[in-house]
Amino acid sequence: MSRRYDSRTTIFSPEGRLYQVEYAMEAIGNAGSAIGILSKDGVVLIGEKKVTSKLLQTSTSAEKMYKIDDHVACAVAGIMSDANILINTARVQAQRYTFMYQEPMPVEQLVQSLCDTKQGYTQFGGLRPFGVSFLFAGWDKHHGFQLYMSDPSGNYGGWKAAAVGANNQAAQSILKQDYKDDATREEAVELALKVLTKTMDSTSLTSEKLELAEVYLTPSKTVKYHVHSPESLTKLLVKHGVTQPAAETS
């Protein structure tokens, strides 16, 4: 019966469902996991990279983490070509705001603006929803550090810890149990690695299979967006007991 209502995004089913939006969410459920955790001194984003070939140059291939502006970054789960369009749109919106008002765009205002674009693609004929979910991490003078999650419907909300992509329900369950409001950035990194280790489909977690980024304030009170290198990731994995040092594994 659903086949009568799932060909267009503008038609509701008798149960009040938009099937094309639900199908877009299914596509995200098959993508690599992304997790965001808010701490008292920053925001941590971590994502699972789907390494499809050993020939892929992972050191130059960004798949999960993207910088939108100096004070905002995001993690992505879903169809990457869709994500690239929306990320470029967000970057332009942020730059236009800065040009007009001579100050960074508030994080929630940027998220809301992008979600308005996503919502439009669920309401007009001849379009399909963007098959991508975002975790936005940022800081502004109005609300400090913030973490937002948005889905293909254009809905968004502020979170203390959130997960999107494959096995997101299991990840959310662990986050709900182990998250602490007063956690430091280092503790948030440890929790993110723990969650990804328990929810990833692969047997072992290595630096080639993940991306880790942090948004925090420097001592001079400027916002810093830092993406960990593979070498730094390996050290973190060893430090938190996720993997063994190379000397021990050989």
UniProtKB/Swiss-Prot annotation:
GO terms for biological process: ubiquitin-dependent protein catabolic process. PROSITE patterns: PROTEASOME_ALPHA_1 (PS00388), PROTEASOME_ALPHA_2 (PS51475). Keywords: Cytoplasm, Isopeptide bond, Nucleus, Proteasome, Ubl conjugation. Pfam families: Proteasome (PF00227), Proteasome_A_N (PF10584). There is a cross-link at K40, K64 (Glycyl lysine isopeptide (Lys-Gly) (interchain with G-Cter in ubiquitin)). GO terms for cellular component: cytosol; cytosolic ribosome; mitochondrion; nucleus; proteasome complex; proteasome core complex, alpha-subunit complex; vacuole. Ubiquitous low levels, higher expression in siliques and flowers. Belongs to the peptidase T1A family. This is Proteasome subunit alpha type-4-A. It comes from Arabidopsis thaliana (Mouse-ear cress).
